[in-house]
Amino acid sequence: MNELEQLRQFTTVVADTGDFQLMKQYKPQDATTNPSLIFKAVQKPEYRPLLEQAVRDHHGNSGLDGVMDQLLIAFGCEILAIVPGRVSTEVDARLSFDTEATVAKARHLIGLYEQRGVARERVLIKIASTWEGIRAAEVLQRENIRCNMTLLFSLAQAVACAEAGAQLISPFVGRILDWYKKQAGEKWDPVANGGENDPGVRSVRQIYDYYKKFGYATEVMGASFRGTDQILSLAGCDLLTISPELLEQLAGGQSAVALKLSVEQAQAGNVARIAADEPAFRWQLNEDAMATEKLSEGIRLFAADAVKLEKLVGELAS
């Protein structure tokens, strides 16, 4: 068996792409998208018709915002025709600090999916793991609108999401690594900080162990990988969302893949509970320079790509 086949014995494999043609060959269970991936996909000629149809069908009666929503849903529906499981569709990052607007947008997106005959159980609404986003997820989960909490970089965020009853979290492995590498500069030691000692891998393991120790139902899906070594160091995580480039590398790899994370191991560990109320959340996030900086940066990047996508839609509509 290749590395991808072995990994599937321990972990649900998810495709992290808006390029649904590319994901077919890897047979993922679920798929994740974000504004950056959708923007990248619509640059390709084969996806241009989806963009043009969204503009043609909806610009007159629902404006730019409506076209953007319809484009996200169009990609989601195409993906759901390929994967047997779920697709993650992201709420505009510019709503990251507005609980009510996030709830309203999520309800609207789910309504659009349901108009196309897609059951809400097959959709995860991606929301940034700000305090306001987590509160939105708490409301939405009670309505059976399942949430994927993204831009997650710390245990404090993870615990608050689990306490809110979020369906799933997406801790960003690669972006955590990026921060520590940048801080270390020339002193960075790739050997000492590789494999299971990778700071992004350690963060996900800490979160996974906490969840399993205290019996949270929230799923852990590692995301944002820089290489297959990070992925294989998290074999056993509930889910891992992986880019097509790294899926291809795993499919071509022949190394033995060992289980790295397990419920039994987590439950046997010595883990202390942490507070998840608002003052504790804000203080812990403030004290974690990496998480604070990467959360802010991630929101800015996703918002910027949403603006680029809007500009593209606006040019087509004019």
From Swiss-Prot:
Alphabetical list of InterPro entries matching this protein: Aldolase_TIM (IPR013785), TAL/FSA (IPR001585), Transaldolase_1 (IPR004730), Transaldolase_AS (IPR018225)
Signal peptide range in chain numbering: none
Record's keyword annotation contains Magnesium: no
Annotated Gene Ontology cellular component terms: cytoplasm
Catalytic activity: D-sedoheptulose 7-phosphate + D-glyceraldehyde 3-phosphate = D-erythrose 4-phosphate + beta-D-fructose 6-phosphate
Location in or out of the cell: Cytoplasm
Protein name as annotated: Transaldolase
